[in-house]
Amino acid sequence: MMVFTSCVKTEYHYVDDSMKEWFVDRDKAVFQVGDQNDIKQDFLINDTLVDMIPAWSYFMFVKTDDDLCENIHQDGRVTYYQGEAYSLSITNYYGTSTHFSLYFYGVCFTLDVENGQFSCTECVDEKSLGKVVPCTLEMLDSHEVNGVTYHDVMHFKITDWDAVSSRNTFPSELYFAKHYGPIEYELGGTVRIKRL
């Protein structure tokens, strides 16, 4: 009778500190936004949650690796919107791939950092992916909103508005800054909202 034994090695894979800068800082987690009609609303970002996602590796039915991959999550709401308006997750998978996933008003922007692969998907909610939406992503050194210059900004823009649901809450454009989160966005292709 043969007995297989193994020494299971546990590896921890953490999100790089530079990626953590995309989360909204605690002291900036409550802010106001306003549109071109001077309608203002409060934006509240909840505390950041951190957990370790378990994963395993096997060789000939014997467990050899026990990986724990760090996942960081943050979500938020605005005053006049029913449901979650904002949700950001960043996960380090096995130390080889960092995934940036941003749910914003019904659209999921996903970026594989190491490979530079980007996708945009229409969502029913933050867990339910729908059809792919034509979209661009560019990284800006800075972007000015209401006289304030924000640095390290992601700029998402939907390039085919006809491909998106007709719901007026869908974002057609989003500027998202490190440490601050959403600083400017356009909903339904008509209402432009800026951080105050």
Regions of interest found by a model, annotated:
Residues V8-L196:
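Conserved functional acidic sites
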Residues V3-S6:
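C-terminal motif of bacterial Sec signal peptides marking the signal peptidase cleavage site
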